[in-house]
């Protein structure tokens, strides 16, 4: 007998995947698993969503779980929002939605898209970044919050699992602490990036995907800098409120130095 389902499987798309394909995995897959959980009388269904399920604008105001779910945007954001709405509105079993920000830390074997960027900067193979930032959460802090939600997550509630907003310049300075020789890096100015982004929409998806793959061979991590990823970096909310997760789930935040070090070495 299974009492708890923690559903973390998803297709993370950054602009190159067809909407129908992402929808099939992120929404239909979640619905199928939720239906099966109800039929098998599972006690609690914990859905690992994302901060991207929420409407990010305005980015300079307090960002909490009362924000509207996103209704337009890229396939990943929209399908995760639809799945979260489905899960949290279910009445047949207890449900909880966990909404992490940008996850980094130990055992990033593949590595993840952000992990690859961190490791690319650390190795000196990625000599430039966008002048933006992200809210980083340590994978161990996230895991503890998910575990706590089994007992402490309230039915039908969503929880933002966030750390603190950090600019890529701050992240870069932390990375250099773990370099034998400090690498040089160029940050593309935000205004220049914002003016250039509309031009990417003029090119076919297939061509952009191939160009990204080629760039990634020379500069590891650069293949993940798609139009959607860059928009996320330059428009990431700066005031994500994790007080609800701290109160209900006992969320504690690790120092950024620990998270970056674990990403590089563990």
How should each PLM-predicted stretch be described?
Residues 1-25:
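NAD(P)H-binding glycine-rich loop region in Rossmannoid oxidoreductase-like domains
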Residues 117-137, 141:
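A conserved pocket-lining segment of Rossmann-fold NAD(P)-dependent short-chain dehydrogenase/reductase
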Residues 145-225, 242, 256-264:
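Mid/C-terminal beta-alpha module of Rossmann-like enzyme folds, strongest
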Residues 59-97, 102, 126:
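Catalytic helix-loop patch of NAD(P)-dependent Rossmann-fold dehydrogenases
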């Amino acid at each position: 007998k299974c009492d708890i389902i923690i559903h973390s499987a998803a297709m993370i798309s950054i602009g190159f995947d067809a909407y129908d394909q992402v929808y099939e995995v992120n929404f239909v897959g979640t619905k199928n698993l939720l239906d099966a959980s109800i039929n098998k009388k599972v006690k609690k269904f914990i859905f690992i969503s994302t901060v991207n399920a929420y409407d990010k604008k305005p980015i300079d105001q307090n960002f909490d779980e009362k924000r509207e779910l996103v209704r337009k945007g890229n396939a990943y954001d929209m399908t995760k929002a639809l799945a979260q709405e489905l899960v949290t509105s279910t009445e047949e079993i207890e449900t909880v939605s966990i909404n992490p920000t940008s996850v980094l830390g130990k055992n990033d074997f593949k590595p993840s898209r952000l992990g690859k960027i961190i490791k690319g900067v650390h190795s000196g193979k990625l000599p430039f970044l966008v002048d933006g930032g992200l809210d980083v959460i340590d994978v161990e802090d996230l895991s503890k919050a998910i575990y706590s939600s089994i007992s402490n997550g309230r039915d039908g509630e969503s929880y933002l699992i966030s750390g603190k907003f950090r600019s890529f310049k701050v992240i870069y300075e932390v990375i250099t602490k773990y370099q034998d020789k400090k690498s040089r890096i160029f940050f593309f100015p935000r205004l220049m990036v914002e003016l250039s982004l509309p031009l990417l929409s003029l090119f076919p998806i297939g061509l952009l995907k191939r160009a990204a793959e080629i760039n990634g061979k020379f500069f590891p991590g650069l293949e993940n800098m798609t139009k959607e990823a860059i928009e996320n970096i330059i428009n990431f909310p700066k005031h994500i409120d994790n007080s609800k997760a701290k109160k209900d789930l006992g969320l504690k935040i690790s120092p950024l130095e620990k998270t970056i070090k674990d990403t590089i070495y563990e």
